[in-house]
Amino acid sequence: MPYHPPVKRSGEIAGHKTSISLEPLFWNLLREAAARDGLPLNAMIARIDEERIRAQTPPGLAGAIRLWLAARQAGRGASQ
């Protein structure tokens, strides 16, 4: 798989404008997860952000999204 640098996208979470840099693979996985859950992309990101800020040592938002997606993929693999 060829390497693609991160792509920065802007959005709004809890009334605050923010930008997130993720590799295209993660953007694609995040869009798929949002579609499966019937959520707009910003709502999915907000959900992950809410989980992130409850952590004892919260990671950055981009890292939290990557970790959330990896955990979701691992969970789906275990159930298949």
Question: In which residue ranges do the predicted regions lie?
Answer:
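Amphipathic alpha-helical interface segments used for dimerization/assembly
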Residues: 34, 45, 69-73
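Basic side chains
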Residues: 8-9, 17, 31, 52, ...
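Alpha-helix N-cap/helix-initiation sites
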Residues: 19, 41-42, 55-62
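Short, electropositive, low-hydrophobicity segments enriched in small/polar residues
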Residues: 19, 23, 64-67
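C-terminal structural segments of small proteins and small subunits
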Residues: 57-80
